[in-house]
Amino acid sequence: MQNVNTYDCIKKLVTQLISVLIVINTIAWPSIPKAYPIFAQQSYENPREATGRIVCSNCHLAKKLVDIEVPQSVLPNTVFEAVVKIPYDMQIKQVLANGKKGALNVGAVLILPEGFELAPPDRIPPDTKEKIGNLYFQAYRPNKNNILVIGPVPGKKYSEIVFPILSPDPALNKETHFLKYPIYVGGNRGRGQIYPDGSKSNNTVYNASATGRVSKISRKEKGGYEITVENTLDGRSVVDTVPPGPELIISEGESIKVDQPLTNNPNVGGFGQGDAEVVPQDPLRVQGLLLFLASVTIAQIFLVLKKKQFEKVQLAEMNF
């Protein structure tokens, strides 16, 4: 009986410990650099604003390049590759949430036309599966299968991300047509500078909140600094807090102005967006084009043969 009580006690203690860890992880999760795709999904119904800007740029302030490659035309109900390229210098390291340096992650959002969606696993060709690797794609919303997000994933391994896309069949989906459609993409490398609530991350520059003289700089126990700025006019002091990560570019005794940078800008990443176009091709149109080309080729062959025959007749008449 005592053993049973002891077992129940231990089981209860372990359950409580797991619950506490889950709560702590939930609270701390936003500061972790792996959270950025979720920020957009939680805060915005659509990742692309009416102005054409993708909402990831609200948190990732630096502009960087991103590129996308898709076929110019695709047949209905076929799988094709959309390759998103997020280039950056693989040697650089970023500031992590704890202030230490680490490798960059990358992420991307792909906005497809209505009707296009992620290809089912059983439809993806083996060579495409090999390019995808262990990547996991998800829909931006349960009702938006045409908007796909990925990341964060290690940038050194996935600076090129291959999306397997299934094209629609206009014969079955009456909302799609054999027209030219735009595809939009956004891609980022590294952590953002601002969280959705407007607060700064430790991956950005910190500015002075007041004009005055730096009277004291204190290093905090867990990293970062507290900078005391004394107003030389009224003697009031303001304390600016800098989290671990950014490096100070001011010193004690220095006179500073409001909004003057106190730190360097540690950000080495950035966000970029691009677009491409794809045209679903009508198979009958393709067959008609091939038939037309074949008929033109045959006509040219007959024309050449007829010309040679005519030349032979002319030559025979001249000899006669």
UniProtKB/Swiss-Prot annotation:
Origin: domain of life: Eukaryota
Subunit record text: The 4 large subunits of the cytochrome b6-f complex are cytochrome b6, subunit IV (17 kDa polypeptide, petD), cytochrome f and the Rieske protein, while the 4 small subunits are PetG, PetL, PetM and PetN. The complex functions as a dimer.
Binding site for heme: 36, 56, 59-60
Functional description taken from the UniProt entry: Component of the cytochrome b6-f complex, which mediates electron transfer between photosystem II (PSII) and photosystem I (PSI), cyclic electron flow around PSI, and state transitions.
UniProt family annotation: Belongs to the cytochrome f family.
Compartment list: Plastid, Chloroplast thylakoid membrane
SUPFAM superfamilies for this protein: Cytochrome f subunit of the cytochrome b6f complex, transmembrane anchor, Cytochrome f, large domain, Rudiment single hybrid motif
GO biological processes: photosynthesis
Claim: Magnesium is one of the keywords in the record: no
Keywords: Chloroplast, Electron transport, Heme, Iron, Membrane, Metal-binding, Photosynthesis, Plastid, Signal, Thylakoid, Transmembrane, Transmembrane helix, Transport
Gene3D superfamilies in the cross-refs: 2.40.50.100, Cytochrome f large domain, Single helix bin
The protein's required cofactors: heme
Chain segments annotated as transmembrane: 286-306
Cysteine disulfide partners in this protein: none
GO cellular component terms attached to this protein's record: chloroplast thylakoid membrane
InterPro entries reported in the protein's UniProt record: Cyt-f_TM, Cyt_f, Cyt_f_lg_dom, Cyt_f_lg_dom_sf, Rudment_hybrid_motif
HAMAP family for the chain: Cytb6_f_cytF
Protein's UniProt name: Cytochrome f
GO molecular function (one): electron transfer activity
Topology of the protein relative to the lipid bilayer: Single-pass membrane protein
Cofactor note: Binds 1 heme group covalently.
Organism: Huperzia lucidula
Signal peptide: 1-35
